[in-house]
Amino acid sequence: MNKQVSYYCYGISFIDMAMLTAAQIKQMEDGDYIVYKRQKIKRQKGVKPISIKITPAIRQLIGSLQAASPTVDDFLLPIVTRSGYTGERLYMHIRARYSKYQKYLRLLAEELGIDFHLTSYVSRHTAAMTLQRNNIPREVISQMLGHADLETTNIYLDSFDNEVINEAAKVL
């Protein structure tokens, strides 16, 4: 289910999902939003927060995850499972959870007969490509992915075109 959260939340990374807190839910005129800065770049100058409207699908997914496994401290999702962890200890805990998540994705791919390397990052790629295929401007996709500049998004999305070409070539 974390994979679905990642997809519906614009391809949010595992570390960003893990670090989300209830305090990052903001009420705005047109509904509730998750507002956060990517862990990867949050300390860089001029980084804008990403705002994700909480749709009924997102609300249901979060509710299902919280019902299945209790959250600790102020974390929004039950990825962090130990209370009171901070700093290096928290980082190592999240890394261990990430490794377990990746392992289960590999097992799921095997069970379903999926013939490519299924990772947590696939949901980010899938979200970006779905947006591009639906003619969403790259400037908007860039903002949704939290990229610092449009060039990063262009490189990111153009690399997918090569992946599609390579997959198509296998059919020949």
Where would I find each of the regions flagged by the language model?
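Active-site/catalytic core of tyrosine-dependent DNA strand-transfer enzymes
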Residues: 55-115
